[in-house]
Amino acid sequence: MSKSTAEIRQAFLDFFHSKGHQVVASSSLVPHNDPTLLFTNAGMNQFKDVFLGLDKRNYSRATTSQRCVRAGGKHNDLENVGYTARHHTFFEMLGNFSFGDYFKHDAIQFAWELLTSEKWFALPKERLWVTVYESDDEAYEIWEKEVGIPRERIIRIGDNKGAPYASDNFWQMGDTGPCGPCTEIFYDHGDHIWGGPPGSPEEDGDRYIEIWNIVFMQFNRQADGTMEPLPKPSVDTGMGLERIAAVLQHVNSNYDIDLFRTLIQAVAKVTGATDLSNKSLRVIADHIRSCAFLIADGVMPSNENRGYVLRRIIRRAVRHGNMLGAKETFFYKLVGPLIDVMGSAGEDLKRQQAQVEQVLKTEEEQFARTLERGLALLDEELAKLSGDTLDGETAFRLYDTYGFPVDLTADVCRERNIKVDEAGFEAAMEEQRRRAREASGFGADYNAMIRVDSASEFKGYDHLELNGKVTALFVDGKAVDAINAGQEAVVVLDQTPFYAESGGQVGDKGELKGANFSFAVEDTQKYGQAIGHIGKLAAGSLKVGDAVQADVDEARRARIRLNHSATHLMHAALRQVLGTHVSQKGSLVNDKVLRFDFSHNEAMKPEEIRVVEDLVNAQIRRNLPIETNIMDLEAAKAKGAMALFGEKYDERVRVLSMGDFSTELCGGTHASRTGDIGLFRIISESGTAAGVRRIEAVTGEGAITTVHADSDRLSEVAHLLKGDSNNLADKVRSVLERTRQLEKELQQLKEQAAAQESANLSSKAIDVNGVKLLVSELSGVEPKMLRTMVDDLKNQLGSTIIVLATVAEGKVSLIAGVSKDVTDRVKAGELIGMVAQQVGGKGGGRPDMAQAGGTDAAALPAALASVKGWVSAKLQ
């Protein structure tokens, strides 16, 4: 019996654990501190800084099963998903890594043992082919002489992409930096399937399938293109779980493995589909994986960046459900089956199941309102189409008005053999982006581009001032040896008490000083293992190697500590009051306020906000000690410590505890005891995205300031109402009741005045061919009273045509009334349209009553004067 996908995943990790590798958990799909990546798309992403030498781990061998998404930017597989055997938006990448430990020999031997040993995957050796980089003789000889693969199944691949080292078998992290040759392992499905070996003209067939890529990072590519050997070569490998599962389960398509068969059956059940070969089932089965795990990792549907990619995937799935005949919301119902089929890899998702389901359901309901109208519009446009290409402007209008991502439009068009002018769509999108950029004035921070090779030791938990040495200086992102007074720069020290922004806590401010210089620090940021002090040299000069005294702004740090500790208390309180589905989705902790984004599907009730406040203040009054302990990550999680959204943790973590009330992983700075916080007050609660709420709160002196401000406002209101704060509510109720009574009396007076005005107006009506015509401009009459006056006049005059107008704040209001017996000859809508056009407006209504507005008050007299002639012509 073949292994299940879950068993294959576990076997891979167990094998490499037996070879001395640290099993490292999958990192978030949202890359930590890497602006170059939209989503995690490879196993090595979380180790990128280790390979670059900017980060160090307490292990030199690692193995992972990394969750990945490829559905935006460079790696965009979305349009092919569901229509090919191996394209997915979400996949798991099995990998083993060596950080300056073993190299080619062991990497190849490990791979061969896992794939062919009877104890592990037991693949037939004669079915395996390998490729190596053309000049990588070392790898070639290991495969041939040590492993024993015949020469005819070892293929050298040269530079096949038009440049030196541009090859399918040469891997590069970027234009510069670590790179090296790779060897790939292929599985031959047999001659009953079309396709040729890698490097042959038929290589795109499905017979030979790549199952493992092993990268040997042995060079550092320089800006001039030269390759320098790395002092400690490393290994990065990747094997798609779905691909190897297909091989081990003896199927040719990833969608036929046990995991997808189970999901496809679940999709059929919730949509009512009966044909299990329908491609839409495959699309939805794939998309629920990416959508559920993206939401669990903190991405919410929106119209920008990662949120927009998520929205595109959800809407594509919903549209395919619509094609299958789904009559109600269905997508969210697949989260449960997904958790079941993922096994141990779905534990994080299971903890957030309710939240993920609610976000998916809300998004589907919102899109369902526009899906039908959008599809109808698309059908109309396609019916009018004379050629085979839908223009980009129409595709953009569908996106802009109905929320149709262009790939969804392309899906519909592809089913009818119609192309989409994607260049035209992109031009319209770029124009919209240009307008948005001009409106926002957003610009990139050059400091984010700094690369620092040195490391800084943070000593700010125990010190607010200490002596350090300048190890690097940067101006405009470039390393310099010295700076002078007036220059803005980033200063890196060997050790520092300054906290660099992390975990939502802002960076410290303060001063770096010496006998002849003073550098004002306005912010502190991390650059790999270095801590950069960002600011301006106020006086003197500063150079690399200088000794400095680093002084943190103590008062500011103290306020930040209170706010950060209060954030932990509030997080725990929210989970008690609202439920354990609450998890942090983002935060900001500075010296003035704390801001906390969390998962919750509705606005908090006032009484819930009060209970959270009371809970936090109760812990403050308990004056609990705030304790920190360093422990293994897994031990901390077992203890129940909550992790911060988006943070990356080492194997040894800092655990912060406040009695039995709160335990979290945190590297930030905190108060010594909860009592130091003094007072906690929530000042606002609002929504930021579907399923995400935001609380802003203040502590200590800031909270006391808000209490005083509230008291001052109450006193001012009490003074205005000639009362005191003790009976203020009664006073306000009394004023409101009196106001309602006066408004009622005023309305009655207005109606009486209108009735009197109507009586006066009736005498001004003239006879036009047996019909009474009344045309008048009224002053001092509210526009909303015109309708009442027309009704009164129609009752008084019998067969009649009435046009009334008034001007308020430069705007013209018009109304026309026609008695029923005259509407066969004169229609109020046509009449009011004729008048409105002359005063720069438009309007309409029923044959017997119509209203309009206009902007040209000066033209009103002439417009009203034209009514008699127009009516006379109609009544002849």
Swiss-Prot record:
Function as written in the Swiss-Prot or TrEMBL entry: Catalyzes the attachment of alanine to tRNA(Ala) in a two-step reaction: alanine is first activated by ATP to form Ala-AMP and then transferred to the acceptor end of tRNA(Ala). Also edits incorrectly charged Ser-tRNA(Ala) and Gly-tRNA(Ala) via its editing domain.
Protein name: Alanine--tRNA ligase
Reaction catalyzed: tRNA(Ala) + L-alanine + ATP = L-alanyl-tRNA(Ala) + AMP + diphosphate
Cellular component terms (Gene Ontology): cytosol
Assembly behavior: Homotetramer.
Similarity field: Belongs to the class-II aminoacyl-tRNA synthetase family.
Residues bearing PTM N6-acetyllysine: 74
Keywords attached to this entry: Acetylation, Aminoacyl-tRNA synthetase, ATP-binding, Cytoplasm, Ligase, Metal-binding, Nucleotide-binding, Protein biosynthesis, RNA-binding, tRNA-binding, Zinc
InterPro entries in the record: aa-tRNA-synth_II/BPL/LPL (IPR045864), Ala-tRNA-lgiase_IIc (IPR002318), Ala-tRNA-ligase_IIc_anticod-bd (IPR018162), Ala-tRNA-synth_IIc_core (IPR018165), Ala-tRNA-synth_IIc_N (IPR018164), Ala-tRNA_ligase (IPR050058), Ala_tRNA_ligase_euk/bac (IPR023033), DHHA1_dom (IPR003156)
A UniProt-annotated Pfam family: tRNA-synt_2c
Domain notes per entry: Consists of three domains; the N-terminal catalytic domain, the editing domain and the C-terminal C-Ala domain. The editing domain removes incorrectly charged amino acids, while the C-Ala domain, along with tRNA(Ala), serves as a bridge to cooperatively bring together the editing and aminoacylation centers thus stimulating deacylation of misacylated tRNAs.
Cofactor note: Binds 1 zinc ion per subunit.
Organism for this UniProt entry: Shigella boydii serotype 18 (strain CDC 3083-94 / BS512)
Subcellular locations according to the entry: Cytoplasm
Main localization category: cytoplasm
Keyword S-adenosyl-L-methionine belongs to the record: no
An individual GO BP term: negative regulation of DNA-templated transcription
Coiled-coil ranges per UniProt: none
Keyword Acetylation: yes
The protein's required cofactors: Zn(2+)
Binding-site positions, Zn(2+): 564, 568, 666, 670
NCBIfam families in the record: alaS
Primary enzyme class: ligase
EC number: 6.1.1.7
GO molecular function, one term: zinc ion binding
